[in-house]
């Protein structure tokens, strides 16, 4: 937990005094465990939490979290009553949805806090904010925020290329500022304007506005491997480890695992680890990735199974049943980073490797 605290303070140090901080804990806290991460962020002084769905938000409320929670994804208007009941803020992405939310809230009573979502170039959700759409969208946003039962606290957008293109990001940012000004000219001012995701928090201070929304960087990973690690002193929060189930002597010529994709060229000692793609350890790692034993690399041989994988410890004689293998992380003598694993073909991103670690793997918080 001290690494999460370290990253939080490092990111807070980038923002001016008074800038609010939304910590994203969607996808089970990027695989780290949403409730423990959220509780730590609340303790550290975060102002808001961000999730993707109603179920994620309710999980936090039922765990005792008091911070404001914004659902960034779609929640059917039918569940407006639950949004009000649990005091959850909902992203509102078009006028028809706003009207549906308003109608449902009026049936059940109360008031629903919303943040207006603007599509400035992500092409996913939001009022269209390209230059030829802005006047119409400003009028629709004004109509939405005046609907009964809705309290329009904030307005936000999401950058599509903030980790790779400053030009594209500034186009989106300019569109966002323009729509805010157009709505203001029509008579409505938002108290929270936010657009800075992880990459923008590191790269573009101009985009901080009233609140930043760090996600992957909170957990110690850069949004893109090409980014300069010197932008912020981040520490990976998670290490993935497994203990050796057994060690077997296997003769030369034996084929290892499903499909016989690896044939032993020598008599070998194979350590069996009780972790596989059923735990989120990718099948694509087969015959490509290594694990660490006290700084020494033991390559995965053969295909990663659903529940197990085999690694070659012939040259690491001290490995025995119960020895600890580091799958992602560092032991001070060597490192097996999530980014390194993600770069193996077919390449993916650190986000995917983290969020696909399944519930079968227990989380231990230190």
What are these regions (language model features)?
Residues 1, 5, 13, 56, ...:
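Active-site anion/phosphate-binding pocket segments in diverse small-molecule metabolic enzymes
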Residues 1-6, 13, 17-194, 208:
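Active-site-proximal beta-alpha core segment in soluble small-molecule metabolic enzymes
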